[in-house]
Amino acid sequence: MISPLPTPCEWVDGKAGVSIPLDDRGLNYADGAFETMSCSSGEIACQSLHSDRLSLALEALRFPHPEAIAQRVFDDICRCVASVGHSGTARLTVTRGSGPRGYAPPDSASPRHILTLFPLSGQTPDRQSCGIAQIRWAHQPQLAGLKLLARTEQVLAAREAATQQWDDMLMLDAQDHVISTSRGNIFVFFGNQCVTPDLSQCGIAGTRRQLLIETVLPQLNYVVDEQPLTLAVLRQADAVLISNTVRGVVSMSRIEDQHYPESAFPRRIQDALRQQVASWVGG
């Protein structure tokens, strides 16, 4: 059952009922970054992880004083989320603000932030099917790992999934390395060994991915390695899991004609991640 939304549920620079100007550079040039976050009873989970990643994205985009901007923005959105006691998800978008025509950002730009709240969705399936997307991740190491507004590859991959009736699409780079799905990060299991793709050239380094690598999987006695990954390796795996903020952890039932048996251990990882996220609520 989908929970009702609070009122207000949208803010621009901390103010409800404000429109976004047509000269906003996020709208015109995707000049900005965003974060998707989970909230519980008016508090944002993994707040510091999201704030740190936002700061890195703003630094890569050459925003002035990125850490200060991220801190100010999170102070503001935490107030908004708390004011309505929201439980569900939230999207934070930070743009460079308004500016004249042309790619070059103005020196006088004033960053703008938009917060949108979404209700708790109904229960999602524990397992999902994946096709293999035709669209490939482009290498751009200067922007790798960051959640920037320009998400063209994932938009096209998601369109492929809908057209071909897959739950999600596996996304590779031009060198045929597996990077992610259109919705999340990938973890491949061989016994107690876990491999997750190296994201130094492209992809998004998710906050749930970070928790899994640094805390959850080691606590469950898995050895985690970040390295290039191929489809051939995936086909030999015991299990493949996908992580993101909204769904937590979901296991793959199949990748095209490759089927993976149902197992209890993805549920243990899901439960452990959920407990870890709960401990980060408000922090």
Where do the PLM segments sit?
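Helix-start/capping segments and mature chain N-termini
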Residues: 1-79, 95, 100, 104-283
